[in-house]
């Protein structure tokens, strides 16, 4: 993207294996969190943008697969991180090269390293948090304590990880889950800024073996002091304008997709949101992808195929 910005792709995988090799292996799990972290190097502001996991996008050819239209979360299944980055760059007109990927175990350790997080949860979130706690405990082989009540709560690592997985509470589905993920990242960031350099360095060292990243360890350690200079300015989800009530798209064998309305206009909006560019014109490739997706939408928009 533009000069003066550094963009990272943050990925959370639902891979059930805690080993790094398994996380980075093609076909091991989906990426249930896809978040662009954009750092403005001049103003020291950070913006977070979740790409909704069910968004229909073009996954460019890689690893023996041809170009294919899939949900964003599924790109990882085709060729791991590389396919996910290629998809984001192609469809959103970005040039991200660096990524950080975590699994459940890594997120648990990160939250515990900053001393847990405090936030408000609803009654429905409480119910689902405790449901997901059981599953997260099984996946990671960790013990846990259920969260006793709604309202203002203190969550430890495994509880916060379960919170990030909730998608059925309060009728918000994946949009709500993406928002919860960004909320936890924001809280981790704020807690990290309150630590001293030594504490923060120790915390990061403690999670590195559960993180897959393109950034060399020495560079990560070197970047730690600058954490204190940055602030979280804003966060949102992509696509901004969307339609997520279609049951199926038989042409590409997809159920319950999210359509960007349209991809082209959403990409223009994204570049305004992240980089302050007015009237951004997406590439001709994005316009073609956008037109194809719009045609799929038009063809499959009929009463029996729409959730009421």
What are these regions (language model features)?
Residues 1-308:
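Non-catalytic, solvent-exposed segments at the cell envelope interface
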């Amino acid at each position: 993207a533009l000069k003066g910005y550094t963009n990272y792709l943050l990925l959370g995988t639902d891979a059930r294996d805690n080993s790094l090799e398994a996380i980075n292996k093609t076909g091991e799990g989906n990426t249930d969190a896809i978040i662009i972290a954009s750092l403005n190097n001049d103003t020291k502001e950070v913006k977070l943008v979740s790409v909704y996991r069910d968004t229909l996008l073009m996954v460019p050819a890689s690893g023996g697969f041809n170009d294919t239209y899939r949900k964003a979360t599924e790109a990882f299944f085709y060729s791991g991180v590389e396919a996910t980055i290629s998809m984001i760059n192609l469809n959103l007109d970005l040039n991200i090269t660096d990524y950080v990927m975590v699994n459940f175990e890594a997120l648990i350790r990160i939250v515990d390293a900053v001393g847990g997080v405090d936030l408000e949860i609803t009654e429905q979130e409480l119910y689902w948090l405790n449901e997901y706690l059981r599953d997260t405990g099984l996946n990671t082989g960790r013990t846990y304590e259920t969260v006793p009540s709604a309202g203002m709560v203190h969550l430890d690592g495994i509880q916060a990880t379960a919170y990030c997985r909730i998608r059925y509470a309060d009728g918000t589905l994946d949009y709500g889950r993406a928002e919860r993920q960004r909320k936890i990242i924001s809280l981790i960031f704020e807690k990290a800024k309150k630590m001293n350099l030594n504490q923060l360095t120790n915390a990061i060292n403690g999670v590195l073996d559960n993180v897959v990243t393109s950034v060399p360890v020495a560079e990560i350690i070197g970047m730690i002091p600058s954490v204190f200079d940055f602030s979280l300015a804003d966060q949102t989800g992509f696509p901004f304008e969307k339609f997520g009530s279609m049951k199926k798209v038989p042409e590409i064998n997809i159920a319950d997709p999210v359509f960007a309305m349209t991809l082209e206009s959403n990409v223009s909006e994204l570049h305004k949101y992240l980089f302050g560019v007015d009237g951004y014109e997406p590439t001709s490739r994005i316009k073609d992808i956008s037109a194809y997706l719009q045609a799929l939408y038009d063809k499959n928009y009929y009463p029996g195929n729409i959730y009421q």
